[in-house]
From Swiss-Prot:
The keyword Glycoprotein does not apply. It holds the Pfam family SpvB. It is found in: Secreted. This is Mono(ADP-ribosyl)transferase SpvB. GO terms for molecular function: NAD+-protein-arginine ADP-ribosyltransferase activity; nucleotide binding; nucleotidyltransferase activity; toxin activity. The active site is at 471, 501, 538. The gene is spvB. It comes from Salmonella typhimurium (strain 14028s / SGSC 2262). Its EC number is 2.4.2.31. Belongs to the SpvB family. It comes from the Bacteria.
Length: 591
């Protein structure tokens, strides 16, 4: 069993990432920001392709939480923005989307008014009306449709997220999945994902527990607190035996469904003895941690008294397994607890046979550090099998660009207005600047080096055999009339001064779709594991990519319907295709 803290940087440099079960990641060495990260898999059984995408994530810059300092298991959520102060819980507040991007209200038009009033969703009618407001990320990258539904009574609000792959996510439909002020139900700070459904009728249902006073000494500084705001992930159920097209939560707050799989997050209710398989049903009240703490960034107290002690995977096949709830796998978490700060120090995976027999545990933490090198230059000791190759600074720069640097960098490259303070902070945090008040020359040089590192990191990725990619643009704006003319002049050569993001899989619906043909030797690269948004395929091109306009197919022309039918669009909704006014066929010039 390995203790995480206490290693010197020299020791960490020699440690190889552990080989984890499928779905897990490894130790990531700290970059210029000084942050290290680890990802541990949860014992999640594969279903018919639709299982919860959850894992334990560690960041050395993370705060305290239900898994100890630095660790988290975040589900999809939407929250009010707090970086500019405490939310006012009115129309002046800003929201943060599931990817952390600020949300803005979608423009209202005559064809698509925003907001609208709804009494139903599909074939499901509601007993009241809802005001539905569409939002989108301020910087578009995920291409989902986001709707904020507000009912007639206080606290009766939730979010719908229509993913680009057709999956529908429901967030905060019931009070159990909303983090709100206990004294004001309408003051909701976070909406947690509560249900997801695929076009094939496969569902995932998330259950949460509210904080309470169980096993808490309610005297002293704990007296008089209202601790009911916090929500803990309790169960994730999936593998519904019978497919259903509609969300279960439309008609019931507690769906009565036959689930085949349940992932249980246990906070001490079922016992943590590794020799005793825990039961499916909680046997006791949950345990209290030694280092309770509170958060106040939303304007009310969010008190945390719990630690997740284990994660359990149950199967429900009574005819095949002989019992209703069969434990198959268990991630047992062990902590170094004290009243000051609790740290996760060990994570063991245990597997169980159908008769309850426990297989030998798998240690998921890092292997012990290798012995120190021999003195006196003796090189007879074999090389440590834990030695690894560090990730290059160029790949680190590309990874950060994909996560949050793309907006600033591309605005700078295009000569648009950009947040200079944010740019300086980025360069400072990535060690491209040594001061937050550089001269103009120092700033330009640092930006040049940073952009060059991103480009070199991109060029180091493997080439692919893709021959066509897509890009959606919104050019039908008065301010972009000159740009539209450039893109609609056959034979014209467009030079994109910024990094150009494209999709090899889907044509994102907008008024203009670029059908971009590639030749062997092009400089575009699939980001793959380097990408921050793992769910989407992205081919990125370096700055100053040249594209030649070969043909334009306008809406209403003879070839438009034929070419449109050949495109794989980002949304199957036929109404959205009316937004497409033109398809521009162009080719990347390698020279």
């Amino acid at each position: 069993m390995l203790i995480l803290n206490g290693f010197s940087s020299a020791t960490l440099a020699l440690i190889t990432p552990p080989f984890l079960p499928k779905g897990g990641k490894a130790l990531s060495q700290s970059g210029p920001d000084g942050l290290a990260s680890i990802t541990l898999p949860l014992p999640i059984s594969a279903e018919r392709g639709f299982a919860p995408a959850l894992a334990l994530h560690y960041s050395s810059g993370g705060g305290n939480g239900p898994f100890g300092v630095g660790w988290s298991c975040a589900t999809m959520s939407i929250a009010r923005r707090t970086s500019h102060g405490v939310p006012q819980y009115n129309d002046s507040d800003e929201f943060l989307g599931p990817d952390g991007e600020v949300l803005v209200q979608t423009l209202s038009t005559g064809d698509a008014p925003n907001p609208v009033t709804c009494f139903a969703y599909g074939d499901v009618s509601f007993p009241q009306s809802y005001t539905v407001t569409r939002y989108q990320p301020r910087t578009e990258s995920s291409f989902y449709r986001l709707e904020y539904w507000v009912g007639n009574s206080n606290g009766d609000d939730f979010w719908l997220l229509h993913d680009s792959n057709g999956i529908l996510h429901l967030l905060g439909k019931t009070a159990a999945a909303r983090l709100s002020d206990p004294q004001a139900a309408s003051h909701t700070a976070q909406w947690l994902v509560e249900e997801s459904v695929t076009p094939a009728g496969e569902h995932i249902y998330y259950s949460y527990l509210a904080e309470n006073g169980d096993n808490v000494d309610l005297n002293g500084n704990e007296a008089g607190r209202d601790r009911s705001a916090m929500r803990y992930l309790s169960k994730v159920q999936y593998g519904n035996a019978t497919p259903a097209a509609d969300l279960y939560l439309w008609t019931s707050a507690t769906p009565a469904v036959q689930w085949l799989f349940t992932l249980v997050f246990d906070y001490g209710e079922r016992g943590v003895d590794p020799q005793v398989p825990p039961a499916f049903t909680a046997q006791n009240s949950w345990l209290a941690r030694q280092d309770p703490f509170s958060l106040y960034n939303y304007g009310f107290e969010i008190r945390l008294h719990r630690l997740c002690r284990q994660v359990l995977m149950f199967h429900h096949f009574p005819d095949e397994l002989g019992e209703a709830d069969t434990l198959v796998s268990r991630l047992l978490l062990e902590y170094d607890e004290n009243p000051i700060l609790t740290q996760l120090c060990a994570a063991r995976t245990l597997a169980y046979e159908g008769d309850g027999y426990r297989r030998a545990p798998v240690n998921n933490m890092m292997p012990p550090p290798p012995p120190p090198p021999m003195m006196g230059g003796n090189s007879s000791r074999p090389k440590s099998k834990w030695a690894i190759v560090e990730e290059s600074k160029q790949i680190q720069a590309l990874r950060y660009y994909s996560a949050q640097g793309y907006s600033v960098i591309n605005k700078y490259l295009r000569g648009d207005d950009y947040p200079e303070t944010q740019a300086k902070e980025t360069l400072l945090s990535r060690d491209y600047l040594s001061t937050n008040e550089p001269s103009d020359e120092e700033f330009k040089n640092a930006m040049s080096v940073y952009i060059n590192d991103i480009a070199e990191g991109l060029s180091s990725l493997p080439e692919t055999d893709h021959r066509v990619v897509y890009r959606g643009l919104k050019l039908d704006k008065p301010a972009l009339s000159d740009v539209l003319k450039e893109y609609t002049t056959i034979g014209n050569i467009i030079i994109d001064k910024a990094f150009m993001s494209t999709s090899p899989d889907k044509a994102w619906i907008n008024d203009t779709i670029l059908n971009i043909y590639l030749e062997k030797g092009h400089k575009g690269r699939i980001l793959g594991d380097v990408a921050h948004f793992k769910g989407e395929a992205e081919m990125l091109f370096p700055p100053n990519t040249k594209l030649k306009i070969e043909s334009i197919v306008n809406c209403g022309s003879q070839d438009f319907a034929s070419q449109l039918s050949k495109l794989r669009l980002s949304d199957d909704a036929t109404a959205d295709t009316n937004r497409i006014k033109r398809i521009i066929n162009m080719r990347v010039l390698n020279s």
